[in-house]
């Protein structure tokens, strides 16, 4: 069974099974995402229709690895993979501040990508939306 860190050494398209705890959930332009982690690190999972709960640990099966420019990795279970809850709690040694920073970076990247693909409206300053001056 792979660790989150092991996923980084796999080629795009390779599949792996790993265990991790769901730390954050978000949706961008119809894509459901989770930030998950184990003792070795954190990664993003595209969930598809899989039902997961924040704070629970899962075994992610047939997770397809995706490698991106800049050296970051994510996985997807949206096309045939699955997430099965497990009784054991997966340890995540990263502190809450680090987890939150990672979540903000990954969810921000997804929003930017969604806007570029036309799944989200262009960003507009909140003051402009409420009729205020910028």
Task: Give, region by region, the residue ranges found by the protein language model.
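Small-residue (G/S/T/A) turn/hinge positions that recur once per unit in extracellular repeat modules
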Residues: 61-64, 81
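Generic beta-strand structural signal
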Residues: 56-58, 73
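OB-fold nucleic-acid-binding modules
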Residues: 1-26, 51, 68-134
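Beta-strand/loop nucleic-acid-binding surfaces
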Residues: 31-56
């Amino acid at each position: 069974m792979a660790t989150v860190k092991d996923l980084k050494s796999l080629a795009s398209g390779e599949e792996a099974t790993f265990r991790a705890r769901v730390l954050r959930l978000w949706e961008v332009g119809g894509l459901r995402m989770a930030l998950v982690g184990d003792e070795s690190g954190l990664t993003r999972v595209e969930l598809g229709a899989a039902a997961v709960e924040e704070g629970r640990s899962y075994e992610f099966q047939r997770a397809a690895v995706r490698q991106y420019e800049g050296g970051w990795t994510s996985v997807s279970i949206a096309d045939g993979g699955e997430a099965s809850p497990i009784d054991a709690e997966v340890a995540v040694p990263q502190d809450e501040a680090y987890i939150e920073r990672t979540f903000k970076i990954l969810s921000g990247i997804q929003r930017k990508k969604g806007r570029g693909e036309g799944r989200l409206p262009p960003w507009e300053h909140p003051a402009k939306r409420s009729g205020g001056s910028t």
